[in-house]
């Protein structure tokens, strides 16, 4: 078992850190606000007064942070105290350029960096079934693998630094586009009088089905838009994707439309609701909601 520092105890970080404790790892935890640290301490974690203090105790240092700015700031702090033999892994969704800067900062101190974004949401973190997309050196990946296995099920080394993040950005592009497409299709079905539960059962086993449909359509029906992944967070990811596509010369037609819809949703006060709340942008002009289908 390893000594693991975990920095960033949000909706993903807290259950991931809890899984590490359940697996028998020793966890040194830090978060900017105190309640998540206290909750983890009650489960057996050690409290750290700063990110640097947590990292100083870790053989493996994990971060799960909400914004590019927070990742940049934290890694500049961590690099100052990094030491040879440490492995740092960032589970945040950020730009490839930021991943490269983190790797360079740590390499100058003899430490190794893995970009290791995850997919599966808080439920996947709690169940230990996350997909972990890793970029970096094979030796560092193999050393960190037992740690990742505490919260991940599908764990892949995708290539060198940045490769894991590239795969995650492709995933997030599809998440954004699928969420918009499912919202549009579900509202059309409701306006045509189709029962949404029947739509889910039938299309869920047809070519039009997808993981995002299975995730979002039940939320359309229940009207539970409490955020697992918020509109604001996915808009952040789509903005990163937009910039990466522009710099790479890739036209982002569907992705651009999805980004505009998420931006509009934020402007309508939906920023902190779950991304499934995007459906409201179609329901209002259609004069119906997915849970109450009506024809005519």
Predicted regions and their residues:
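NAD(P)+-binding Rossmann beta1-loop-alpha1 motif at the extreme N-terminus of oxidoreductases
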Residues: 1-63, 86, 92, 122, ...
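Rossmann-fold dinucleotide-binding core
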Residues: 4, 94-176
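Hydrophobic residues within alpha-helices
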Residues: 16-17, 102, 147, 188
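Residues in the short beta-alpha loop(s) of Rossmann-like NAD(P)-binding domains
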Residues: 33, 67, 137
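Rossmann-fold NAD(P) dinucleotide-binding segment
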Residues: 51-112
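Active-site-proximal catalytic alpha-helix in oxidoreductases
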Residues: 127-135, 156, 160-192, 201-215, ...
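Interdomain hinge/lid region at the active-site interface
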Residues: 161, 165, 209-275, 282
